[in-house]
């Protein structure tokens, strides 16, 4: 299982930053020797990012490998063009990393960040790497003309979001029982389907069925009456602070809203019990339930994984792998992954290495009806 990551200190030799004014000047000048790396969750990157930046949102499941030195930075890109661009330019360009907000970082307080880990790794690999003071929030507030915003493209049901490579080492598309396992020592660029061909970056067009009554989707799925009717969805769990419950006044759907942003400071785990209870209520009434956030890759995934952990007695890794097999572009932020680890300890669950659930018991490992998981046997805990 994943251990809690040790802090990566911002040693004085690596605590080097660039201001947003400096970055704006470089962009105004058209500096072609500038490589921007956006370290925020994929959902935030797709909503808006600094022009020309490439996304390196790293799921917590991969950070330990990176920290131990088992994973080069170039392996964090599954998109060939991004990987080639990084490999070609990292040795000569000025590399600038940014997260959502890093204005208060210093040598003593920046230790537990993804940026701290990446900066150290980049410098170890000989790159001239810096972090952006104030992060994306400060840059966008002062120089929004150099930000690219995509308000309509944040949902995977309309266009496939950029995949997060850190999870490429997981086997995600096979009917064999061994494919539930997290094969973290494989080359993360070698993920293949069951026939050995490279995995496609395309994502499902509609909500993904995790269990016969449980669907994982995005904001647009929650506004499509045809989709909701097709899947028998009458319960909608909205894991955002501000997206509207569109059909709430019609009386046909039951809503629950969890007011959480996709940010490292948010405590999503405090809502696990009521979210799990809401999903169970839908199951008890033989209704479908849609769990959604904005893009359907972070907050809603975290809640879905928590549900599988508690109701099926699965470790975090096993539950995560199941959702990953169904929807390959998931990317919960680092803090949410840590909360799932804490939830695993609270539930007293074993590591996946010690307590694998046999594949014949899992509905989601095969389309064969002979291996359907008996959902009615789920017991509340």
Swiss-Prot record:
Keywords: Cytoplasm, Disease variant, Hydrolase, Hypogonadotropic hypogonadism, Kallmann syndrome, Protein phosphatase, Ubl conjugation. Ubiquitinated by the SCF(FBXO31) complex, leading to its proteasomal degradation. PANTHER family: DUAL SPECIFICITY PROTEIN PHOSPHATASE (PTHR10159), DUAL SPECIFICITY PROTEIN PHOSPHATASE 6 (PTHR10159:SF45). Its EC number is 3.1.3.16, 3.1.3.48. It comes from Homo sapiens (Human). It is linked to Hypogonadotropic hypogonadism 19 with or without anosmia: A disorder characterized by absent or incomplete sexual maturation by the age of 18 years, in conjunction with low levels of circulating gonadotropins and testosterone and no other abnormalities of the hypothalamic-pituitary axis. In some cases, it is associated with non-reproductive phenotypes, such as anosmia, cleft palate, and sensorineural hearing loss. Anosmia or hyposmia is related to the absence or hypoplasia of the olfactory bulbs and tracts. Pfam families: DSPc (PF00782), Rhodanese (PF00581). Belongs to the protein-tyrosine phosphatase family. Non-receptor class dual specificity subfamily. Residues 206-349 form the Tyrosine-protein phosphatase domain. Dual specificity protein phosphatase, which mediates dephosphorylation and inactivation of MAP kinases. Has a specificity for the ERK family. Plays an important role in alleviating chronic postoperative pain. Necessary for the normal dephosphorylation of the long-lasting phosphorylated forms of spinal MAPK1/3 and MAP kinase p38 induced by peripheral surgery, which drives the resolution of acute postoperative allodynia. Also important for dephosphorylation of MAPK1/3 in local wound tissue, which further contributes to resolution of acute pain. Changing residue 182 to F: In HH19; the patient carries a second mutation in the HH-associated gene FGFR1. GO terms for cellular component: cytoplasm; cytosol; nucleoplasm. This is Dual specificity protein phosphatase 6.
């Amino acid at each position: 299982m994943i251990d809690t990551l040790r802090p990566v200190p911002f040693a004085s030799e690596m605590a080097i930053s660039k201001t947003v004014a400096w970055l704006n000047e470089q962009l105004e000048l058209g500096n072609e020797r500038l490589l921007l790396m956006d370290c925020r969750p994929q959902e935030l990157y797709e909503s808006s990012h600094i022009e020309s930046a490439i996304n390196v949102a790293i799921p917590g499941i991969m950070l330990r490998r990176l920290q131990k030195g088992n994973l080069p930075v170039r392996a964090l890109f599954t998109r060939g063009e991004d990987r080639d661009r990084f490999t070609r330019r990292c040795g000569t360009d000025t590399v600038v990393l940014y997260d959502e907000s890093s204005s208060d970082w210093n040598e003593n307080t920046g230790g537990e960040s993804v940026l701290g880990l990446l900066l150290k790794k980049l410098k170890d690999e000989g790159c001239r790497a810096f972090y952006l003071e104030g992060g994306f929030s400060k840059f966008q507030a002062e120089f929004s003309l150099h930000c690219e915003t995509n308000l309509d493209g944040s949902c995977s049901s309309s266009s496939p979001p950029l995949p997060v490579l850190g999870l490429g080492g997981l086997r995600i598309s096979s009917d064999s029982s061994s494919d539930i396992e997290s094969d973290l020592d494989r080359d993360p660029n070698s993920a293949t389907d069951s026939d050995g061909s490279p995995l496609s970056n395309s994502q499902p067009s509609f909500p993904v069925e995790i269990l016969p009554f449980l669907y994982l989707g995005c904001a647009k799925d929650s506004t499509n009456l045809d989709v909701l009717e097709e899947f028998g969805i009458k319960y909608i769990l909205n894991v955002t602070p501000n997206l509207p419950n569109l059909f709430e006044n019609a009386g046909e759907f039951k809503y629950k809203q969890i007011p959480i942003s996709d940010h490292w400071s948010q405590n999503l785990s405090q809502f696990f019990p009521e979210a799990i209870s809401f999903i169970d209520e839908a199951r008890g009434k033989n209704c479908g339930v849609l769990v959604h956030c904005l893009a359907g890759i972070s907050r809603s995934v975290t809640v879905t994984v928590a549900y599988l952990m508690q109701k099926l007695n699965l470790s975090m890794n096993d539950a995560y792998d199941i959702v990953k097999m169904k929807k390959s572009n998931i990317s919960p932020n680092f803090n949410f992954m840590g909360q799932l680890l804490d939830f695993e300890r609270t539930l007293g669950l074993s590591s996946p290495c010690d307590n694998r659930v046999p594949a014949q018991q899992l509905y989601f490992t095969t389309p064969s009806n002979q291996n359907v998981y008996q959902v009615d046997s789920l017991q509340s805990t």
